[in-house]
Amino acid sequence: MMMHPMNKTNKRDKMEKRNNPSALNIFMSFLKLGMVAFGGPTAIAYVREMVVDEKKWMDEKSFNNGVALAQIIPGASVMQVAAYVGFYLRGIVGAFAAFMAYALPAFLIMLFLTIIYMHVKSLPKTVSIFEALRIIVVSLAANGTLNFSKKNIRTIGDVFLLLISALLFILKFSPFIVIFVSIFIGFLMYRRDITKLSLKIDIPREKLRIYKYVAYLLFGVFLFNLILYMIDSKLFLLSTLMMKVDVFAFGGGYGSVPFMLHEVVDKYNLMDAKTFMDGIALGQITPGPIVITATFVGYIVGGFIGSIISTISVFTPSFIILLSSIPIFDSLKHNTIFKNILHMILVSFVGLLVAVTIRFALLVDWSIQALIIFIVSFLLLYKKYNMLLVVLLSLVLGYLIL
């Protein structure tokens, strides 16, 4: 039985309509996903399920390219994947819609939790709960360190660089210095591989237009910070601080923790380390990446406006970097020099996370009960149990036995 040509056309039109959603459709879909996608990096699986299996907006290969790109640039991986999907579907508007929609639920929930925190943190009944939260943060940092180690530590040289990075951070050297030292070591180790060919980056002509939008965004960032500088020095500090953190947050959201700790606690004394740990812990009760801690920091330092400024600032640089990287991704993923330097950076991140874990552990009042909560939460995280479940179970244990 032959199908009428008109029927074929209608069927094709329906497929194109289904596979090319509007920016509003993208926004609403990622908004819904952002409400339930707990688990940090594991949330990428939820994004894949929605866009590849359920809605069939992308094929597997295209989605995997987005995941691969998110792994080699700074920023929270799941946020970068969301933006990549949006860009694939609707260009710059789609990228912005997916990126903003995915972050919005986490921001609102974190803001709500922070307001509650400010009202109850001094109550006697909440002391044990926040002590349990800090133990969870130690478990989280230890688990993140273990995962980073398994992925990136390959040689004795890697272990040596890890130890140097950890020692420098423990000695209160800036993590930015640690990263630059790692890049320098990487250049020294792989300088023989540097050739004209290895430094060549090909940009397809049809993809050059994206840099026009990147230029607009960079100009917008400049104006944004200029206005903040003129009206409120504290808000300007929050903005530049969070942007700096985001630029160096390789390896996903966990990579931001040492930098944010250094900037917020050590360098500018905006809060003490225990309060910062509380912010990280509250972030685990929300969907979205660990960098949503920026909302907590922003609210404590600058109120509601501060929370908005911090949240926008901690996501903006990585969004711009993603857009800038899409045209050159094919060159980057096969570039030996880039891959080796990135490896050095990620190895140094393991060292930074080791130092952060030690520092956080020293802030906990350890007891047999605290050790039980740590072991239980660490094992559950190691076994990839849902983050929200782990946090809630640990809070119940803390309330009962601490």
Swiss-Prot record:
One of its GO terms (cellular component) is plasma membrane. This is Uncharacterized transporter MJ0718. The chain crosses the membrane at residues 26-46, 67-87, 96-116, 126-146, 168-188, 213-233, 235-255, 289-309, 312-332, 338-358, 360-380, 381-401. PANTHER family: CHROMATE TRANSPORT PROTEIN-RELATED, CHROMATE TRANSPORTER. The keyword ATP-binding does not apply. It comes from Methanocaldococcus jannaschii (strain ATCC 43067 / DSM 2661 / JAL-1 / JCM 10045 / NBRC 100440). InterPro entries: Chr_Tranpt_l_chain, CHR_Transporter, Chromate_transpt. GO terms for molecular function: chromate transmembrane transporter activity. It is found in: Cell membrane.
